[in-house]
């Protein structure tokens, strides 16, 4: 039974192979005529059925409309491969997670705690101010200086490494450079700054304050110029401050900053009391101790708000203690705050806003939820795992953001180029923060990287936006707080609650009130969806084919069939041509068999083998006739088994 089925299957494939070897059995012309006569597409049938003139007309129309179909198909395929998206927008109100709120004091350290550390640095800055400041006491706006600081003792360890200089550009081709801390230059009788014959404008145009940045043991130096002495001093002060505090342990720096109970005086959320204990501490390189409300870290439950308005949001009273500000560090007295997602790192310096002391600041929040399509529709990243940059902010258990990626990328370049890490960013594994003792050339290297356009563009190209992101749009309004009639009792109560003092220790210069709440419409969802898909592509391809030529999928199959048949015939013809060519190459030059040796010998001795030039006709020798049979049947008999007939 099984052997019989195998035999039948073998015979079936044998016959199929024979049919393939023989081909369709038609010529090209016969195939085209058959296709035009049997296809369901409109147009080709008219080419073979109509008269000569109409044949030409229908042939041209068929070619034109076929070209239009292929052109439209090309446009549709290109549109599909462009992976376009459609954007939908929805606005409304619903119960939502309240954003995480990070608050900082713009002054990172209490001056009373760090004054011993900064004594020498502050004296240096005061001396520099005396030597570059201007006075408008006279009509000529002459420069005045403080003689009491003429004999001040300057610590060379602080200023020799990165000195402040004044560049005299009276002769642009040959500028003169003076060290601000050099007493012999600035207090000589003929020093340039004591010249009172020039006014303030000419002085500002002539003299520029700069930082001198040197590498390779002071053999290669550049000057970082500033348009204002204030900018130069503050930049230089920040740099020196970072060098000083790089040797201070983090725990000590935290103790030198503002405690949560000192900064956050009162707290209400949704009408329910809260306190500084509901805030999570985080240390910021620029602002010191910062505190985050509703961060959602370490399994903490996040808080939600179900109603709009200030009564259902967060209310805070902050005290920034302006009398504890470092005099040469911060020129702005305010609180710095930022609204961000839960479990995301707050980049307060770059994305935060200020809250002014002596005011009540109300912030109405609208949540923008952005949802982008993944690759290939966009270059966004889902969680940052496909970004070739190590996220240094993972130690805070925070989610991916483009800000964290850019800073991690810059820190990697810093470690690679300068051989040390910058103190403002997290420390990569196997590296150390920059110090003057171990890395004497790190400051010029840092400024070179910071000013490098190529480094910024490289990091921007590596870092991608997250596919799902949330932004908080804020409408901010302010009013004086407290009012003149209420400030006395409010300050008494706040002072007592802060340090149990009956004396007023809180004043308008440091007090801030914040109201953060949802607007009437608290969310706006902007989401992307694919503008084209396979269903869209197939329907449009079929629509164009049906509109221009009245065809369908079966017509495409018919067209594919004739193409396969034509290719089949072409292959068979090519194989036959190759086979015939091989046979011609293998065919002998002479049709008769070659003569034997004896025949060749006899040809030289027997003249009968010589060529006869005359027209001699040899008589035919009569042959033997064939035998007589009653019948002669010559037929090709092909044995056919009974199974095959069945």
Curated annotation (Swiss-Prot):
PROSITE patterns: ASC (PS01206). Signal peptide: none annotated. Residues 586-646 are annotated as: Disordered. Residues 79-551 are extracellular. Disulfide bonds join 104-290, 214-221, 267-274, 380-467, 405-463, 409-459, 418-445, 420-434. It is found in: Apical cell membrane; Cytoplasmic vesicle membrane. It catalyses: Na(+)(in) = Na(+)(out). The keyword Ion transport applies. Pfam families: ASC. One of its GO terms (molecular function) is ligand-gated sodium channel activity. Its main location: membrane. Residues 610-619 have a biased composition (Basic and acidic residues). GO terms for biological process: sodium ion transmembrane transport. Component of the heterotrimeric epithelial sodium channel (ENaC) composed of an alpha/SCNN1A, a beta/SCNN1B and a gamma/SCNN1G subunit. NCBIfam families: ENaC. This is one of the three pore-forming subunits of the heterotrimeric epithelial sodium channel (ENaC), a critical regulator of sodium balance and fluid homeostasis. ENaC operates in epithelial tissues, where it mediates the electrodiffusion of sodium ions from extracellular fluid through the apical membrane of cells, with water following osmotically. This is Epithelial sodium channel subunit beta-2.
């Amino acid at each position: 039974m099984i052997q019989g089925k195998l035999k039948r299957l073998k015979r079936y494939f044998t016959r199929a192979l024979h049919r393939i070897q023989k081909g369709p059995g038609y010529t090209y012309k016969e195939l085209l005529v058959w296709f035009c006569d049997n296809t369901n597409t409109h147009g080709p049938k008219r080419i073979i059925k109509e008269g000569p003139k109409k044949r030409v007309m229908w042939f041209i129309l068929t070619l034109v409309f076929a070209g239009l179909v292929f052109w439209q198909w090309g446009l549709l395929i290109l549109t599909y491969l462009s992976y376009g998206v459609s954007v939908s927008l929805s606005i409304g109100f619903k119960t939502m997670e309240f954003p995480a709120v990070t608050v900082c004091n713009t002054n990172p350290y209490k001056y009373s705690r760090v004054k011993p550390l900064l004594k020498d640095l502050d004296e240096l800055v005061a001396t520099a101010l005396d030597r570059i400041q201007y006075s408008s006491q006279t009509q000529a706006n002459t420069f005045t200086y403080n003689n009491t600081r003429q004999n001040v003792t300057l610590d060379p360890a602080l200023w020799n490494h990165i000195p402040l200089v004044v560049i005299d550009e009276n002769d642009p081709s040959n500028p003169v450079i003076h060290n601000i801390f050099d007493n012999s230059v600035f207090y000589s009788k003929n020093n340039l700054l004591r010249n009172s014959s020039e006014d303030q404008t000419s002085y500002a145009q002539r003299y520029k304050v700069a930082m001198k940045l040197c590498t390779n043991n002071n053999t290669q130096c550049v000057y970082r110029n500033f348009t204002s002495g204030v900018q130069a001093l503050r930049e230089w002060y920040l740099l020196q401050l970072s060098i000083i505090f790089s040797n201070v342990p983090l725990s000590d720096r935290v103790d030198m900053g503002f405690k949560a109970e000192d900064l956050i005086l009162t707290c209400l959320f949704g009408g329910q009391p809260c306190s500084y204990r509901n805030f999570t501490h985080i240390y910021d390189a620029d602002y010191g101790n910062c505190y985050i409300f509703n961060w959602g870290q370490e399994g903490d439950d996040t808080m939600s708000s179900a109603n709009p308005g200030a009564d259902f949001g967060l209310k805070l009273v902050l005290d920034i203690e302006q009398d504890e500000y470092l005099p040469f560090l911060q020129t702005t007295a305010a609180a710095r705050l930022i609204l961000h997602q839960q479990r995301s790192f707050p980049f307060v310096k770059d994305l935060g806003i200020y809250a002014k002391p002596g005011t009540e600041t109300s912030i109405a929040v609208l949540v923008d939820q952005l949802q982008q399509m993944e690759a290939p529709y966009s270059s966004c990243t889902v969680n940052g795992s496909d970004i070739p940059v190590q996220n240094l902010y993972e130690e805070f258990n925070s989610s991916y953001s483009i800000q964290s990626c850019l800073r991690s990328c810059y820190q990697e370049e810093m470690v690679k180029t300068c051989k040390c890490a910058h103190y403002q960013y997290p420390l990569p594994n196997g590296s150390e923060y920059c110090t003057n003792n171990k890395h004497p050339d790190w400051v010029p290297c840092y400024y070179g990287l910071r000013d490098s356009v190529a480094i910024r563009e490289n990091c921007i190209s590596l870092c991608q936006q997250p596919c799902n992101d949330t932004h908080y749009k804020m409408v901010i309004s302010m009013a004086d707080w407290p009012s003149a009639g209420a400030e006395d009792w409010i300050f008494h109560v706040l002072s007592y609650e802060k340090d149990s003092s009956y004396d007023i220790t809180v004043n308008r210069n440091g007090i801030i009130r914040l109201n953060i709440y949802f607007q009437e419409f608290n969310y706006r969802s902007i989401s992307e969806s694919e503008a084209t898909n396979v269903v869209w592509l197939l329907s449009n391809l079929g629509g164009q084919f049906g509109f221009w030529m009245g065809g369908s999928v079966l017509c495409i199959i018919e067209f594919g069939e004739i193409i396969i048949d034509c290719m089949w015939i072409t292959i068979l013809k090519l194989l036959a041509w190759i086979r015939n060519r091989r046979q011609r190459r293998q065919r002998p030059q002479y049709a008769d068999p070659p003569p034997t040796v004896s025949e060749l010998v006899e040809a030289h001795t027997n003249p009968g083998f010589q060529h006869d030039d005359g027209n001699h006709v040899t008589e035919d020798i009569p042959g033997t006739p064939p035998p007589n049979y009653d019948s002669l049947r010559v037929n090709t008999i092909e044995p056919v088994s009974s199974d095959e007939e069945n």
